[in-house]
Amino acid sequence: MNFERLTTYLDELQERYGVPGSDLLVTKNQEEIYRHLTGYRDYEHKEATKEDQLYRLFSATKVITMIAVMQQIEAGKIGLYDELQKFLPEYGTLYVVDESKDYGWGNWPDASAPCHLSHKPIRIIDLMTMTAGLNYNTEPPTGMSLSEDKASAGKKEAQMKGAPGETLTQKVMRAAAQMPLLFEPGTHWAYSLAHDVLAAVVEVVTGQRFSDYLEEHIFLPSGASDLTFHPNAEQEKRMAALYVSKNGTKEMLPCTDLSVLGLRMLSQFESGGGGLIGGVEGYSKVIAALANGGVTGKGERLLTEKSIRLFMTPYTSGELQLDFMKMQKFGYSYGLGVRVLTEKGSSRSPLGEFGWDGAAGAYVLIDPIHHLTIFYAQHTLAYDAVFTEVHPRIRDLVYEALED
């Protein structure tokens, strides 16, 4: 193995792409085979990147949520083809917008949009494959009032009506049923709040708060620490400074407007789609189990090998694949909550490798064929080149290094 070219590339990220700091960890057969840190945790104060640094994982959270859902499918508490209303009755009556418009960030349909009754129910598999018709409106839903949460600086506290003992995660996702669907379930693909809804479903079937479930059934068995929705004061101090690209360029500015977090600003909301905060080492311990037959480095089983094979299976084709291609995951299709490599010519990694990424630049690759994982973290928002250029290049350089 020769990682020299990869190391050189990572060291050039600040100059070429404006990345203030980064951390990359590669494992094979549960063992770390490469790790390299670059730059600064806080660029303005020249505080160097450290191994115990924490990041907002954003949508890299989705991979963890899929493990939880698949565990409950294995336990027989959730069925792939169960209707969502079985767990959240609010989704029993659904409305679909009459016209397919260019809905998107900041322009989602609301309850006033012309709609008609849906002809199809939402099923669990529709949520897992992002074909449910939901949108990605992360603004607090109708009926929620916000106030400052004195116990968590910068976060908000929410008040909503709901059943006694019901978590805010469930309340928010039940309220989200008011939003009209973008299309009939199963007919198109759209990036959405599906994983957040699935987190609420896990809470319903287990009777546990989502964070408690993840800690007991995923993080502890993996030996993973510092993965949380609710960082304590000590963990907050280890958070990397968050930056945002200026107009899509490599010029990075400190991100002072945390309203970009949307629902994740709610102190008690546990977003299965993007709410986790964590470090590179802890996250890598979890995904290493997926690359090694579902068994953690501690010898505890998270998932069966059958479930791992399901993650390696693509589900988008035809119209659905055309929709997914707008995400610019070249060579990939979408599977059960993750991207799946389906075109060998576009990557040095093997067919069936899967994973996802996060808005601040996190990158997840799980390769069960070679028992390999890649987890890369940085902390910059709104810079597309990270996803279309940096992530694929890191992937290919890792595999080149393994071949040398």
Which ranges hold each PLM region?
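Hydrophobic (often cysteine-bearing) scaffold residues that line and stabilize catalytic clefts
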Residues: 2, 6, 57, 61, ...
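Short, conserved catalytic-motif segment at the N-terminal edge
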Residues: 2-57, 77-79, 93-106, 341, ...
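Active-site SXXK
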Residues: 7-10, 30, 56-84, 93, ...
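Extracellular/periplasmic catalytic domains that process cell-envelope and extracellular macromolecules
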Residues: 18, 117-121, 366-368
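A generic structural motif
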Residues: 39-41, 257, 380
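Short, surface-exposed loop or secondary-structure junction motifs
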Residues: 92-351
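Short glycine-rich, acidic/polar surface loops and turns
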Residues: 337, 358-366
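Short, well-ordered beta-strand elements
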Residues: 364-365, 371-380
